[in-house]
Amino acid sequence: MTKKIEKGDLVTVFVTVWDLRDHIVDQTGEEGVTLRAGAEDVFPRMDQALLKHKEGDRFDLVLEPEESFGDFDENLVHLVPVDKLGVENPKKGMRFSHIPGVPVDDGRGYIITDVGGGMAVLDGNHPYAGWTLRFEIQVMRVELVEEGDIAESDIFIPDFLKVANDSVKEEAEDRLEV
């Protein structure tokens, strides 16, 4: 009998993320991604759902925006003169850790979503903010690991499996308590 996932186990999962039109919007590589169950490295509902499964299981999890990347916030979209960005020839897709002249220090990154007429649109929302997403999860491997056997720096969680920011994480955790 295959053991059920427990808090602290190292779990390797293959994840495919779908939008509501059944388009794949992201997925892990073939090797999957390894995370520590119950360590709150992924969305709270995903973390909780993993604890109900075992190696070899496949399951779907639908997350609303407030359980994953948050609602789209227009206040996080800024129109900035390109000469204030400090880069030559800014292009769509470029990332910035902050916006010059905008007092924001929450660790949020910004991405240029449009450039034209000497101006750039920088968006601090996660690309999937406001989206309801379906996560198709396959549990590939479960390993019992003793405390201290693996450093947290050895675990890499892709952005599409992590809560976008602390306020979204708190809201998602609150929904679990209801």
Model features per residue range: what roles?
Residues M1-V178:
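FKBP-type peptidyl-prolyl cis-trans isomerases
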